[in-house]
Amino acid sequence: MRKSSCKMGTNSNTLVKLKNAGYQQNDKWLVKGVSLEVEKGKIVTLIGPNGSGKSTTAKIALGIYKKFDGEVEKYTNKIGYVPQKVSIDWTLPLRVRDFMVLTESLKEEAIDEALSLTGVVHLKHKNLGNLSGGEFQRVLLARAISKKPELLVLDEPVQGVDFTGEIALYELIKKISEELNCGILLISHDLHTVMSATDHVVCLNGHVCCSGSPSDVAKIMSIKLVG
């Protein structure tokens, strides 16, 4: 595997672009041949089964992997990230406000603004261990947008939430994209749930199976299932 560099530059709309990107571990490809582009104010969703390379693709875009195949062009360093798993000792008396500033300093105004946008400012002084799954996901989103990112990467941001909560969170994600004019790279397991909140879909299974608008991808997948 050759080392590929991330390029920085100026572009009116593009925030990150992957060109034939891939990553292998222990001589096994986790994902390969992925090309996609995330623009300001647009939501690109990666869907696919477990182990299909969704999280790996997101980490390539984020620059977490220093060695990968293909090319990544990034046009912003203002990036927010919600990982798939967050390690927290739930026995600690950690308030939402403390969690918001756990890894970096924030002004109180920025904390309140982010929590307000995600609808949980009333939980600011509540312990994390007392939050529901949906409330915690909203707090994670608030922390990710607290510094007004241009690019937001969300890895399964509705996990641990019931169906009604999922719909509400996807609506919130769309609202965040519109209000902050940020591009979003979203990982989801269910195309039908996320359809109304995304602009472009990339279906992965170790490689790109298909891509396009949500309706186009849904048609392709239904044809494959019927066929």
Predicted segments — roles?
Residues 127-131, 135:
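Conserved ABC ATPase signature
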Residues 148:
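Conserved catalytic motifs of ABC-family nucleotide-binding domains
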Residues 152-156:
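Catalytic Walker B motif of ABC-type/P-loop ATPase nucleotide-binding domains
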Residues 188-189:
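H-loop/switch region of ABC-family ATPase nucleotide-binding domains
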Residues 207-227:
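Conserved beta-strand-loop-alpha-helix hinge in the C-terminal portion
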Residues 108-123:
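Conserved ABC ATPase "signature" region
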